[in-house]
Amino acid sequence: MAGFMKNAMSYLGMSDVAEGEDDFEDDVDTGETSFDSDHSVTPMPSSSASASTPSAPREQSNPFQGGRVSRITTIHPKTYDDAQMVGRAIRDGIPVVLNLTGVAEAVAYRIVDFSAGVVFGVRGSIERVTPRVFLLSPAQVNIKVEEPEDKGPAHDLFAD
């Protein structure tokens, strides 16, 4: 009965973790393997061979023509669910102007957090244009930023 009480108190957070919960049992039978080692692995054919498949070819739009950006997308999300549009555009290599004016501050923070993660994932950059407008660019787009005069440290993400 003492074991039950100890486990119950641990579960409810009224005591330290019950002893023995951190121990792992090895139920693995080391005599058998889960795969045949007699088979060899062959690499998949290159992309040129896969292009000759009978399936319809997918056309990829390339926003870079001659090394220049041919378009920039402006996104004005209303809810957090609209943030996926940012991810799609950045993933496709299209720079995004993210306008968060009129969005509740808590939602705006979540959208900026998501967008920063997407930009980090594609090795891009994010620049604040105004307190609620951001420029997000993929890695292949270089942004030249002119630093304004020092206004002092800004303590808020959306501060002037």
Curated annotation (Swiss-Prot):
GO cellular component, one term: cytoplasm
Function: Cell division protein that is part of the divisome complex and is recruited early to the Z-ring. Probably stimulates Z-ring formation, perhaps through the cross-linking of FtsZ protofilaments. Its function overlaps with FtsA.
Alphabetical list of InterPro entries matching this protein: Cell_div_SepF, Cell_div_SepF/SepF-rel, SepF-like_sf
Biased composition (Low complexity): 45-57
Protein name: Cell division protein SepF
Gene3D superfamilies: SepF-like protein
Keyword Lyase: no
Presence of the UniProt keyword Cell division in the record: yes
Pfam families: SepF
Subunit structure and binding partners: Homodimer. Interacts with FtsZ.
Keywords from the named record: Cell cycle, Cell division, Cytoplasm, Septation
Compositional bias segments (type: Acidic residues): 18-30
Region described as Disordered: 18-72
Subcellular location: Cytoplasm
GO BP annotations listed: division septum assembly; FtsZ-dependent cytokinesis
